[in-house]
From Swiss-Prot:
Residues 53-76 bind DNA. PROSITE patterns: HTH_MARR_2 (PS50995). InterPro entries: HTH_MarR-typ, MarR/SlyA-like, WH-like_DNA-bd_sf, WH_DNA-bd_sf. GO terms for biological process: regulation of DNA-templated transcription; response to stress. It comes from the Bacteria. The keyword Transcription applies. Residues 4-139 form the HTH marR-type domain. The gene is ypoP. This is Uncharacterized HTH-type transcriptional regulator YpoP. PANTHER family: TRANSCRIPTIONAL REGULATOR, MARR FAMILY. Gene3D superfamilies: Winged helix-like DNA-binding domain superfamily/Winged helix DNA-binding domain.
Amino acid sequence: MKVRTQMMYDMETLLRKVFKQIRNEINEILDKELSRNEFTILRILSEQGPKKVTEFAPILEVSASHITAVTDALVEKEWITRIRSKEDRRIIRIHITEAGEKVLQHFNEKKTEYFFKRFDCYTDAELATLIELFSKLDKKR
């Protein structure tokens, strides 16, 4: 039993360390021009379409006021627009602009390039195993 306990400890330590490294490296790529939260909002809008500002707070696990600040910055950069609902004028939805789509595409390419470099040392078989293990871990939630 001690061996398994040590394995769990080692796994937890390595997961935390590796995910922190990857997060920091991706933030380094993004932070020169946009924050991780700005990138995530653009990605969600591109994939899922217009959303109310309040829908992002639980997704990003931040306060509504933080989302307002992030969306204000995105509006200022002209990467998103705010549009009032015609049915209920109190509801404002944010939409990604063409410029926002271009920025998102640019950073998606940079992120893909990063992952190719980061995992270049692994064979296709090793990557397939890693994907299989993470998929299995994801299903355990």
